[in-house]
A protein has these predicted regions:
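Active-site lining segments of carbohydrate-active enzymes
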Residues: 1-96, 107
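Carbohydrate-active enzyme catalytic cores, enriched for enzymes
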Residues: 97-184
């Protein structure tokens, strides 16, 4: 929201937010004790890289070289997380963590496409787009999910499915989401 609200923020508020993004995001990611997520092949990679990329995009006009470095590191390391979707869209962390980790992956891809006109092929990683169909297959007729890993039984609407449907131009990806939205 920093860049969206920039013109409405007081200068002191801008400074506090900018310094927090740098200290709690960029600087922390330089510390090897905290930066293990760069080599992770799971949702931690997507979640952390997404947050850093959003911070870099928000501060790009103010600190372009630092922001560029953050985005380049993201593009270098985020493909490791994409391996989990291959080869055919099955996801190793179950229904719940697909929703969590993939939501950050989708936000990252959408932000890169919005800012730069490309996601540098992230959405084309083997199995990534197919994983939306995997989520439909993970849903039982009664509306709960087949759970494994540490996923709960309760299924819920995954808002990123709307992104997948738009990207794939396939509204059939939304049929189960409608059922979730129609629940009392």
């Amino acid at each position: 929201g920093y860049d969206w609200l920039y013109d409405s923020l007081q200068p002191d508020t801008r400074r506090v937010v900018r310094e927090a993004i740098i200290a709690k995001g960029f600087d922390a990611a330089k510390n090897t004790r905290h930066a293990w997520f760069y080599t992770a092949k799971n949702n931690w990679n997507s979640v952390c890289n997404s947050g850093l990329a959003y911070g870099a995009l928000a501060l790009f006009e103010e600190i372009p070289e630092v922001s560029k470095g953050i985005i380049e590191k993201c593009m270098e390391t985020n493909p490791k997380a994409m391996v989990g979707y291959g080869p055919d869209g099955g996801y190793p962390e179950g229904f719940g963590y697909w929703g969590y980790g993939t939501s950050f992956q989708v936000m990252l891809i959408a932000a890169l496409e919005s800012a730069f006109g490309t996601d540098n092929g992230l959405s084309q990683a083997p199995g990534f787009m197919e994983s939306a169909r995997f989520m439909q297959y993970m849903t039982a007729p009664g509306g709960d999910c087949f759970c494994f890993s540490d996923s709960p039984v309760e299924a819920e609407c995954n808002m990123m499915m709307f992104w997948f449907a738009g990207k794939a131009k396939d509204l059939s990806l939304l049929w189960i989401e409608r059922q979730y939205l129609d629940r009392p």
